[in-house]
Amino acid sequence: MTSSSVAVSLAAGFGLTALFLVGSNITFNAGLYALFALFTGGLALVMVAIAVSISGAVPSSRLSLVANAFVYVYFTFIWNSLANGVSNLLNNQLGIGGSLRWHLTLFIKLLSPTQSYKTLVDSMVGSGENAERLARLGMFSRDADTEVICGDVLRGNFTTVTVQGFGNQTFERPVCEAGSQAVPFYFSDPAVFVYLLAWIGVAAAVSYYTFEKVDL
């Protein structure tokens, strides 16, 4: 299936769904739905482009199926561990810490098409001016330096709030609030969407190289 046929199928599917929602009693947010369709369509086109490039690079359909499954699993479940490993390498072996370390780590995380799609959707369904920032921060585990990521990387205001737990025990919970500055453009939703679509170019380059190699 080509990218154009996938685009047509997605457009038809989203269009019919939109018509159903408009005609039903369900509250329909057209802007939110359009963003969801855009992000989902972008991811679908990327995965199709990658699948096509892989099918042209391997000798059989069975290998193509296995390779595509591996790529999806790698992007979805392994890439984040790779980014965390690079982060630890930067800090422990190369002595690169602080803001630069977490800038690079977040950028690597965003290069995964499935991870970039997830954080775009998280930002979309979030509320308020801080949704974009919290979506990026949500890509990190609790072991990360939340204060540096919030303040220096995402330009937010880091603070803590006292929360009461079980047995009247209290603990401090870190909070990243909106700051006077917006999230850096290179970590904003438009930039993340560009990173997602860039994989179409990568897949096209692989397909072109494969074609040239076979043609020779």
Language model features with spans:
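Juxtamembrane interface at the cytosolic side of transmembrane helices
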Residues: 204-216
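Alpha-helical transmembrane segments of multi-pass membrane transport proteins
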Residues: 42-43, 106, 199-200
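Hydrophobic alpha-helical transmembrane segments
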Residues: 194-204
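Terminal transmembrane helical anchor/hairpin motif
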Residues: 78-192
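Hydrophobic/aromatic residues in alpha-helical transmembrane segments
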Residues: 50, 79, 202-207
